[in-house]
Amino acid sequence: MAEKKKAKAKGSENKTKATSASVSGFIAAIPDAAKRADAKTLVKMMQEATGEKPKLWGPSIVGFGSHHYVYESGREGDMPVVAFSPRKPALVLYIAATDPPNKPLLAKLGRHATGKGCLYIKKLADVDMTVLETLIAKGVARRA
């Protein structure tokens, strides 16, 4: 019985951690030129918003800063303050955009989709960049 508890506790460890892998190398390896350009733009925007250099979290998330969290369950870990991942179908932004106070901004953003805490954008040309900058800044402020 104790063996199972140990395994379960270890399994609850956060799998996405900051790495020392090269962010510029990761972005340079994005096969789609437009997505690569969008990723470079997001790096600049998020770096300006946080004042932090980008780090690769896990194999495919570019994150800025670090935020320590503790859930009511006792599980805790670290995550980037804001982050994005240039996935094949869309850019995924982890900026707390789906918080209820951001609804009016999302209505002005342009073409996008949302998931649980994520913002999906096919290409930056589809959105209002000023609104996106505001959403990123709000995501940073939320974890300050």
PLM feature spans:
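Charge-dense, helix-prone N-terminal extensions
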Residues: 1-144
